Structure formats: C-alpha cells, structure tokens
C-alpha cells in the first residue's frame, strides 16, 4: 500500500508530516511526527483547517475578554472618573452667585417685651477664621430706609452688627486699631454732593474734622469724626475713644447674655442714667448732665431727646469717593434744634441720645449758633438698643474698672412686665439670609482639595468603623444622660418659677391680712378709748363723750419693721427674677455647648451637616440626596453598554487596534508556515529519493498511497532526523508554548540576528499585548514599576460594594413585591373563575337545553 504525506502546521507549534496509515497500523501516541491518527474508517478526523483553529482561538480570547470586563477595579476607576466629574460640577456650582446659607442655628429663651434673644449658636463655621459660634440676635424683618424726617433702624447699628457677622475672623469689635488718614469734605452750596479729598491740613465740615479709617485689611472703610478717635503716638494708628475709659456694667439689666465665656451686658429703653425733665411739655428740652460713664463716645455733656421731627431732621448728602474695595461706611447727618441747653463745662460738643420706639441713635453734636446743632450718628459705642462688651483675645479693654449702677426700669411695676418665656431647651431651625440682614456666610473655597479631603475622610471612616461605632454608642449614652439632666434642670427652673409666683400671691395675701389687722387694731383701740372715757349720751348710733377728739385716739404706733420687711421682699423678688433668668441663660448656654459637635466620636454624626455646609442649599433637604443616590445607581446599573463604551474610550488601548495587529500577525504567520512547509517537504523528498528529481515527480504524481514507514523513509540519514528534531525544539520555545496554552499572553519580541535567534521569525517585528491595554495587565505592570497607571484601592471597592448591596436589597424587595402582586392576581383570578363556573353551572341547571316537562293538552 502506498502512503501519501500531508504537511500542515499547528498555529504556534511544529509543522510535522501528517501521515495516513493503513487499517492494520496502530496509532503511536509517543511518535512525535504522528499527532493525528488516521484510518480508512475515519478519514474526516484529519488535521483541522487553519481558519477553523484561528476562529476557535478568537472565540476563546473574546470570552476571556468578556469575563475580564466585569472586574471590580474597572468599576473603581469609573468611580474615580465620577468623583472628578462631581468635583468639576461642584467647582462650577460654587462659582455661581447664590443665596448665602449659614446652616443650623439654635435659639434660646428670651424675655417678654424685650425683642432680644439671649443666644444664637451657629453650627456652621466661617472659612479661615477662629471659632465664632455664639451670636446675639436682632430683628431682621425691620426695613432700613430713610423717611422724610428720621433714619429708621439706626444704620450704625445695622452696619456694625452686620460687619461682625461678615468679618468675624478679624474680630470686628470696635476697640481694635485702625489705620486712618485725614481728609476734607468739600461741598457746594447748590448741591448735596460732598467730595472726599486727601489732605494734610484738614478743615471742619458739619462742625467736625474727619478721618478715613481702614480696618480688617482694607475690607471696610469708615468716614468718622476725629472726636470719636484717639491717636496713638502721632502715627497713622487710631483707636476709638472710650476704649481706655471706665465702662458701665449695669447691676440689674433685664438681659445678660454670654459671648462664649465673656459677658455681654445689655440695657434697653432710654438710657438709665439720662431722663427727660419732668413737667416739660417741649420734647426738645433736655437736662441732667449725668454721671461720668462712658458708653463708647459720650462727652461730659450728655442729653436725651425723643425722636421727633421738631427736634432733629435727616440731612441727605451724597458722599463722592474715589474707587475703593469692600465696604465704605458713610455717616448719617442730622440738623437738630435744642432749647435751654445747660452745659456742664461750656464745651460746644455734646452727646445726644435720641430714642424712638424701636431704636436708639447716639449723636455727636456741635453747636453752630445758639440753638442749632449739626449732628452726626456715632460709628461706635452703643449699638441699637444694647451696649456691647466684646473683648478680644489680644486687645482687651484697658484698665477695666466697672461702676455698679441700678437700672431705672427696675421698679416693681416695670420689672413685672419682664417675665421669662418658657422654652424647651434649644430649637434648631435653618437660616438663610441675604446680604441686607446681616447673617452672612461667605462661600467656602471648594474644589479638588475638598474632594481629596472627602476621599481621605472616607478612608478613615472605613478603617475605623468598629471604633467609631463603639465611640458613637458611648456618646449616645452620654447624650441621653445629659438630656435627662437638662430636662431635670429645666423642670427645676419651671418649679422655681411657679414657687416664685406662689410667693407673690402669698405676699399679696399677707399684705392684705396686715391691712385688715391694722384696721381691726385701730377699731379696737377706739372702742377701748370710748369705753374708758364713757358716754354722756348714747344712742344706737352715736356716743357723746363730752370731750374733744384727740388725734392720738385710734392712732397706732408706727413701726419700721414692717416697712423693712416689705423692702426686703421686693429686693428678694428682684433677686429671684435675676437668678431665674441667669439660670435659664446658663441652661440655654449649656444646651448650646452640648449640641455643638466638638469631638472625634461625633464626626460620623456631624458628617451630614458638614456636607450640607459644603453644598449650600442642597444640605437642607435629605430628599435631594436620596434622589441623587437613586439616579446614580440607575445610571450605573441600567446602562452597562454605555459604561463599557466609555471605559474603552478612557482606557486608551482600544480593542479594535489590537485585533487588527493580531490579524496581521496571523496572516504573516500563516504565509510563513506555508513557505516553511514547502521547504520541509522538499527536504523530505530529497531524503527519500536520494536527490533524484525524477523519482520525486514520479512519487508526486503517483496514485498509489505512500506509507511513512517505508524502508527509504526509515533509512534517511541520522543527521537529517536530528536537524528536524533540533529545529522543532527551537521553534517550540518556552514562550511559544505559553502562547499555545495561553492565547492571551504576549509573544516574545523579535531579536535581530545574534545569539539564540529564531531564523524563522525574521519578518516578525511586532510587540503584541493582550487587548492593547487591559486594566489587569496595566495594574500588574504598574506594580512592577513599568507602567504608571493608578490601581483602585480598598475604599472605592468598599463604597462600590455598599452601593451594590443596597441596590440588590432594593431589587429583592421590589421583586418580592412583584411576586406578591402576581400571587394576589392569580388568587383573584382563581376566585373569579370559581364564581364564574358556579354561576354558569347554576344557570345551565335552571335553563337546560331540552325541557323534560310536558305541558297538559286539552282535547
């Protein structure tokens, strides 16, 4: 039998002669040159075609690529892209003009009729500032405007309070140093326009010389009279007058609040040391020079007047200044007419306090003739209805010596109107405010640094989850105990208040009883006197003693003891009210301090408020966060194709390019195999025929089968066999074996002509990587230091796992709900079907198809 040899190649392997054996021959599995077993019964099981093997290899690679697309680090890298996009959106959002948001505040108790709250605690912080948390409140619903005759809601009050909020990081209390320069105010008689000019020698305008002062790094500029300032060592540094004088600390003020641990003393209504003269109908008549007390800038000549258009009128002037930045505060000018002014030391400048129903304006006036005064609203000193003492950490009030005075309103009638308002601890409410109300929060710098900080915070939370849980558990226990303690204290204060009221009622009953006893004593004494003297003539109504009436009859001896008791009771009543208010204020301050997040253990609890502070307006509604979370989840889970395409674009390699290179490689490899197979076939034929070409062509065109076990084939030279074996071993290198077993691995790069080269890969000059940029390979190379691609970390994986778990739970819940609805529908359908069949059966029974009842017939 003649054997025919076919020469083909396994991709990436050895091209060996494929032999067809006879039916009697057996397959020898250990034969290197017979990889396929052939017989007449299974002629179709010969070597597969090259295209089929290439297609199978491509399918395997695509299946592996599809599996690798679900790796977790891809999702982590997508989360990084999502975080960057979110940061860009937030960066853009922070640049938009918007309404300022200062977060949650806690408002404590207040007094009836005062219109003032005792404390406000801001939970938000100001960027780059020292802690500025305790505020006092004022009514923001009052409008600021100038009517025909008065300036409502004192602008100095508004400006100073507003500026405290706006520049809290620079300690904007008025006893700081200012950089001032002298200026002139020039105006023409025909207009109300005033020009501000920088000069060395100043002249008076409106009765005063003027300074232009800057504070807080030129953020605020004020135009102020020299009389309100004091120069320091002949430099350009000035401080407000009164900072080194004695300040008034009132003993019994209705309001006594705390600024941190520092007191803020408030006195309201007309100033306690200045009153209007009694019995004078003219409201412009003032008197009482007053004690030597300094509230800001108060000269020795002081007076008080009601806000009346007859006394003072607003003079509207337009201040023209060169270009400036920040706030430029201009004064308010008044023209006043005062009659019968009594000067204590004959000085032309006096301080006038003009009070109205809801405001107090402090004026600095200069006499230009007998009764006419030019007045300017003071920039410092008393603000609104309250005098503030705001000490600074480094520059405090110099030579602090406080005089004790009693408020004139602390009589029995006036004090009873100041009752404590019942409060239940601290009430949180959100505050958002425009610039004209004073509660201002400048936008926080937000950008990539904040995103990095958020990622670091997330890592810290993930690393210390157990410790944070334990700490928060302990904090919750402490909070519960302290809340119960505050409730007990609040109930105690309420009980003390009720006891105080009960004492008042008891005191009134005692007074009434005392009056009745006095009357009884007087009547008894008169009757005893009449009984001693006797009656000359007695009727049922009259008793005529015959003696003239003596004034001592019926007059009881006066005792100062009872009056002392009454005075002490009134004093104790006032002390009780003061103590109750102080206790209430301390309780509110304790609640504020307690509710202020100030420990690491409360960081997790406080994280939500920090997010609300970073994203103004959005933090006020938890619904928006929930909606945003659901949208992100739907985007990540419902759009896998879009995400896959996005990832292919961002990964950089592109699978299409790698496939093209692989196809080029396979084509070159196939053509090289064909050439090599032909050469090996010629070598084999040469060995078989002994170099005879005629014998080769005879065997080629012969129809007889060729058997590879022929004697001529077995008698081929030993050297040729060894060369074939050596060539096979060199062709199947370790790298090539790896490619056959792992089609996704890389092929060794082409080496040029020296030492260990494969002469059959001379045309291969390509460097192929699996899919050109797989994340797994990139991360491996990044760990080896050959490629700088960031691999994903544990926090992102943890966050992604949390998102998937929550989504899966929600999905299971929805699917369970769908199953329940489906079961209910099937049950209802079954019930309806049973009812239908019963009705149909009853109907058929009552209405049969043929009637078996025969009707009677009449013949």
UniProtKB/Swiss-Prot annotation:
The keyword Hydrolase does not apply. Residues 446-466 are annotated as: Fusion peptide. Residues 576-624, 663-699 form a coiled coil. GO terms for molecular function: structural molecule activity. GO terms for biological process: symbiont entry into host cell; virion attachment to host cell. Pfam families: EIAV_GP90, GP41. It comes from the Viruses. Residues 498-513 are annotated as: Immunosuppression. Keywords: Cleavage on pair of basic residues, Coiled coil, Disulfide bond, Glycoprotein, Host cell membrane, Host membrane, Host-virus interaction, Membrane, Transmembrane, Transmembrane helix, Viral attachment to host cell, Viral envelope protein, Virion, Virus entry into host cell. The keyword Amino-acid biosynthesis does not apply. The record marks 444-445, 684-685 as: Cleavage. Residues 1-6 form a propeptide. The surface protein (SU) attaches the virus to the host cell by binding to its receptor. This interaction triggers the refolding of the transmembrane protein (TM) and is thought to activate its fusogenic potential by unmasking its fusion peptide. Fusion occurs at the host cell plasma membrane. The transmembrane protein (TM) acts as a class I viral fusion protein. Under the current model, the protein has at least 3 conformational states: pre-fusion native state, pre-hairpin intermediate state, and post-fusion hairpin state. During viral and target cell membrane fusion, the coiled coil regions (heptad repeats) assume a trimer-of-hairpins structure, positioning the fusion peptide in close proximity to the C-terminal region of the ectodomain. The formation of this structure appears to drive apposition and subsequent fusion of viral and target cell membranes. This is Envelope glycoprotein. The lineage of its organism: Viruses, Riboviria, Pararnavirae, Artverviricota, Revtraviricetes.
């Amino acid at each position: 039998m003649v054997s025919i040899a076919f020469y083909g190649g396994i991709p990436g392997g050895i091209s060996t002669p494929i032999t067809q054996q006879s039916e009697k021959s057996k397959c020898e599995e250990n034969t290197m040159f017979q990889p396929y077993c052939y017989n007449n019964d299974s002629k179709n099981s010969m070597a597969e075609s090259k295209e089929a093997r290439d297609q199978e290899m491509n399918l395997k690679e695509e299946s592996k690529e599809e599996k690798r697309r679900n790796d977790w680090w891809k999702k982590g890298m997508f989360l990084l892209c999502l975080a960057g996009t979110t940061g860009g959106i937030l960066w853009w959002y922070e640049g938009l003009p918007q309404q300022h948001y200062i977060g949650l505040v806690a408002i404590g108790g207040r007094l009836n009729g005062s219109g003032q709250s005792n404390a406000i605690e801001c939970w938000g912080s100001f960027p780059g500032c020292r802690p500025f948390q305790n505020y006092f409140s004022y009514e923001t619903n009052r409008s600021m405007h100038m009517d025909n005759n008065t300036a409502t809601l004192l602008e100095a009050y508004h400006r100073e309070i507003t500026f405290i909020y706006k520049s809290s990081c620079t300690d904007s209390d008025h006893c700081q140093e200012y950089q001032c320069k002298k200026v002139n105010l020039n105006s023409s008689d025909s207009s109300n326009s005033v020009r501000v000019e920088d000069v060395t020698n100043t002249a008076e305008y409106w009765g005063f010389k003027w300074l232009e002062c800057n504070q807080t790094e030129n953020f605020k500029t004020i135009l102020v009279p020299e009389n309100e300032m004091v120069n320091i060592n002949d430099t350009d540094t000035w401080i407000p007058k009164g900072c080194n004088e004695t300040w008034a600390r009132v003993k019994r003020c209705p309001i006594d609040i705390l600024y941190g641990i520092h007191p803020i003393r408030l006195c309201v209504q007309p100033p306690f040391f200045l009153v209007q003269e009694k019995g004078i109908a003219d409201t412009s008549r003032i008197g009482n020079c007053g004690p030597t007390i300094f509230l800001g800038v108060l000269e020795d000549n002081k007076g008080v007047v009601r806000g009346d258009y007859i006394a003072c009128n607003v003079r509207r002037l337009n201040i023209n200044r060169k270009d400036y930045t920040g706030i430029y505060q201009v004064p308010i000018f008044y023209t006043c007419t005062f009659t019968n002014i009594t000067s204590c030391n004959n000085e032309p400048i006096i301080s006038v306090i003009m009070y109205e129903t809801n405001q107090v304006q402090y004026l600095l006036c200069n006499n230009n003739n007998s009764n006419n005064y030019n007045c300017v609203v003071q920039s410092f000193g008393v603000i609104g209805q309250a005098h503030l003492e705001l000490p600074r950490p480094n520059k405090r009030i110099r030579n602090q010596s406080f005089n004790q005075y009693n408020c004139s309103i602390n009589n029995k009638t006036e004090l009873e109107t100041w009752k404590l308002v019942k409060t239940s601890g601290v009430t949180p409410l959100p505050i958002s405010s425009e610039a004209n109300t004073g509660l201002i929060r400048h936008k926080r710098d937000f950008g990539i640094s904040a995103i990095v900080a958020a990622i670091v915070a997330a890592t810290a939370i993930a690393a210390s989850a157990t410790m944070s849980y334990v700490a928060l558990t302990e904090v919750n226990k402490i909070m519960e105990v302290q809340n119960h303690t505050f409730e007990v204290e609040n109930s105690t204060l309420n009980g003390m208040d009720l006891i105080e009221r009960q004492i008042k009622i008891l005191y009134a009953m005692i007074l009434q009883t005392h009056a009745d006893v006095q009357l009884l004593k007087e009547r008894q004494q008169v009757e005893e006197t009449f009984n001693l003297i006797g009656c000359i003539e007695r009727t049922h109504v009259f008793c005529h003693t015959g003696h003239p009436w003596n004034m001592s009859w019926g007059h009881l001896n006066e005792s100062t003891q009872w009056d002392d008791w009454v005075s002490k009771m009134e004093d104790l009543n006032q002390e009780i009210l003061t103590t109750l208010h102080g206790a209430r204020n301390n309780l509110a301050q304790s609640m504020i301090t307690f509710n202020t997040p100030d420990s690491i253990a409360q960081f997790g609890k406080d994280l939500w408020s920090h997010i609300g502070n970073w994203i103004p307006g959005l933090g006020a509604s938890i619904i928006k966060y929930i909606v945003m979370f659901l949208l992100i989840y739907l985007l990540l889970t419902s759009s896998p194709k879009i995400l896959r395409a996005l990832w292919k674009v961002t990964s950089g390699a592109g699978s299409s390019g790698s496939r093209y290179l692989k196809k080029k490689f396979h084509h070159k490899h196939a053509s090289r195999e064909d050439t090599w197979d032909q050469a090996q076939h010629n070598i084999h034929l040469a060995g078989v025929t002994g170099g005879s070409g005629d014998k080769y062509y005879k065997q080629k065109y012969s129809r007889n089968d060729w058997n590879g076990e022929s004697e001529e084939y077995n008698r081929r030279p030993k050297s040729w066999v060894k060369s074939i074996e050596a060539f096979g071993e060199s062709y199947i290198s370790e790298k090539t074996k790896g490619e056959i077993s792992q089609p996704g691995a890389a092929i060794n790069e082409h080496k040029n002509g020296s030492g260990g080269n494969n002469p059959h890969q001379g045309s291969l000059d390509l460097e192929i990587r699996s899919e050109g940029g797989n994340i797994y390979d990139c991360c491996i190379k990044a760990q080896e230091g050959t490629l700088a691609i960031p691999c994903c970390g544990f926090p992102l994986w943890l966050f992604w796992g949390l998102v998937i778990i929550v989504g899966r739970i929600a999905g299971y819940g929805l699917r369970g709900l769908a199953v329940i609805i489906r079961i209910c529908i099937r049950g209802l359908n079954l019930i309806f079907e049973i009812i239908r069949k019963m009705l149909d059966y009853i109907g058929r029974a009552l209405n049969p198809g043929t009637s078996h009842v025969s009707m009677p017939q009449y013949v």
